[in-house]
């Protein structure tokens, strides 16, 4: 193997999908288009945990009019809280163009102090209503399978891999 092949800036072999961890939603099923809802997504770290400066992303399709996650006003729609089970310090940001299309609407969660070991969790509460907020407004059009797609970069190489099973809901017409 040449030096160029060894250090070409790409991960030669991805981590096997079954070792990446898992993500689940607290609620699944049918939800009315345009309604305000709250969801808790829990990511459980896989075999390699998440290194200091590793990240997860929760991404959504670009064609949506849902409320963006926000972290500043707990009384406003879309208020989102993120916490690590082991008290690792997390940096959280929303970037509407933070991933490749069509999954470019990105909530990025980076471990900035500490690390996650296998079995540790990151809990994301979308549409928190505890402080008077309305929740997260779902998109106003129907979608049979609406994913909260989770990607993970466990070893901090900026090589985000898609989890093998994705949390999803169904967005249906109003009643």
Q: Can you say where each PLM-predicted feature lies in the sequence?
A:
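Ser/Thr/Pro/Gly-rich, low-complexity intrinsically disordered stalk/linker tracts of secreted
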Residues: 1-175
């Amino acid at each position: 193997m040449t030096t160029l092949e060894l250090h070409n800036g790409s991960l030669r072999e991805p981590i096997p999908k079954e070792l990446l961890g898992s993500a689940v939603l607290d609620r699944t099923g049918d939800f009315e288009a345009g309604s305000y809802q709250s969801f808790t997504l829990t990511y459980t770290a896989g075999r390699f945990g998440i290194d200091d400066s590793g990240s997860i992303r929760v991404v959504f399709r670009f064609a949506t009019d849902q409320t963006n996650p926000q972290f500043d006003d707990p009384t406003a729609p879309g208020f989102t809280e993120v916490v690590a089970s082991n008290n690792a310090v997390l940096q959280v940001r929303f970037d509407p163009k933070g991933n490749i299309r069509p999954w470019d609407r990105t909530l990025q969660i980076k471990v900035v102090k500490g690390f996650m070991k296998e079995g540790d969790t990151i809990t994301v509460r979308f549409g928190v209503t505890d402080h008077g907020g309305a929740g997260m407004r779902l998109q106003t059009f129907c979608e049979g399978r609406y994913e909260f797609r989770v990607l993970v970069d466990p070893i901090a190489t900026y090589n985000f891999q898609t989890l093998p099973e994705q949390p999803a809901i169904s967005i249906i017409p109003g009643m």
